[in-house]
Amino acid sequence: MASETAFQATGAGRIVISVDAMGGDRGPAAVVAGLAESASAIPGAYFIVHGDEAHLGPMIAKRKDLKGRCEIRHAPRVVTMNDKPSQVMRHGEGTSMWSCIESVRAGEATVAVSCGNTGALMAVSMIRLRKLPGVNRPAIACMWPSRNPGGFNVMLDVGADIKADAEDLAQYALMGASYARNGLSLERPRVGLLNVGTEEHKGRAELKVAQDLISANAAAGAYEFVGFIEGGDIPGRRCDVIVTDGFTGNVALKTGEGTAKLISDFLREAFGANILSKMAAVLALGSLKRLQKRIDPRRVNGGVFLGLNGTVVKSHGSADGTGVAAAIALAARLAQSGFHERLAARLASAGRAGQDAPDEMAAPGRSEKR
C-alpha cells in the first residue's frame, strides 16, 4: 500500500472519502481528474483511493492538488459492468469496489464514491454495511432538474431494486422527503407517487395501497402528499419528491439523460447549419451556455444509496472528471452534515412512534432546519 499521508476519518473540518478508482467506463484517469478538482474545491477533504497501485500512483503523483491528500489502497481486481451482483457478492473480495465499501464499514472513511456497476455496488454495500433497522429495500435517490424554485426535484428509486411493494414505496416517501427537506432546504416537501395517471382508479393495485400508506404517514414524515403524478410532473412544479420503483425510475432517468443529449445535439446542428446560424449562435452564446448548464447531467451526477448503515454515492459509469467531482462534492456535503446518522434517527423514530426525528442535513450554505 502506498500512502503519502495518514489521516483519521473524523476531525475538525476534516472528512475522509473512500473512492473506487477503477470501476468507471473511462478508467482511473477520469476519477483522478475528479479527485484533483475536488481537492481544490474542498480544502478539508482527504481521499482513500482504491485500485491498481501501479496505475494510480503515477497519476496521483502528477497532481499537485492531491499531494498529502490521498492514500492508495491496492486492490488488484476490478468489478466490470458485465459482472453479476451475485458473483460479486461471493467473489468480490480483493476488488476496488469491495475495498472502497470496506473503508466505510471499518470507520476509516465517512462516505464511499464509485462509478462502478450499480447492481454490484448495491449488493456489496448491503452485504458489508447492512441495512438500517426497519428498512426492507434500500433506494437510490437522484436530483432531477425541475421548474421548482430550487431548480431540482428528488426522485427515488432510480435503480436499486426493480421491485417495490406498497410498504417499500411508503418508506421511499419518508426517506425521499427527509433528503429533500434538507438537501433542497424545504420545510415541508411535497411528495408525489408516479403513476400512469392522476385519477385514483388508475394504476396497479399496489400503487393504490401505497397511496393510502403514504397519505397516512404524511404527518409523521413531515411532508405533504399530493397524490398520483404522471411522467410530465417529474421536472415540474407539482411536487418536490417523486416516488416510484427502481425499474420505472431508472428508465425515466436514462430517458431524461438521453433527451438532454438529443436537445444539445439538435441545437448544435441547428446553429452550425450555415453562416447566419453560426452568427446567431455567437450572439446567443451566453443563453446557450446557461441552457447547457441547466441540462448537463454531469452537474447533478451522483445517486445516494438511502437505507444503509453507511453513506454510498453512485456516480454515473460514464462520468468524466467534472462528473466525478460533482459526485464527490455531494459525498462531501453528506459527510459534513452527518446526514446518515440523522436519517437513521428519523427512520427509527418514525418506526417507534410514528413521529418525526430532528432534521437531517442542511443544504449547502444554509442553516440546518428544525
Swiss-Prot record:
Reaction it catalyzes: a fatty acyl-[ACP] + phosphate = an acyl phosphate + holo-[ACP]
Main location, first listed in the record: cytoplasm
A GO BP annotation: fatty acid biosynthetic process
Family the entry assigns: Belongs to the PlsX family.
Protein name as it appears in the record: Phosphate acyltransferase
Function noted in UniProt: Catalyzes the reversible formation of acyl-phosphate (acyl-PO(4)) from acyl-[acyl-carrier-protein] (acyl-ACP). This enzyme utilizes acyl-ACP as fatty acyl donor, but not acyl-CoA.
Coiled coil region boundaries: none
HAMAP family per the UniProt record, alphabetical: PlsX
Subcellular location: Cytoplasm
Gene that encodes the chain: plsX
Any one GO cellular component localisation term in the record: cytoplasm
Broad EC category: transferase
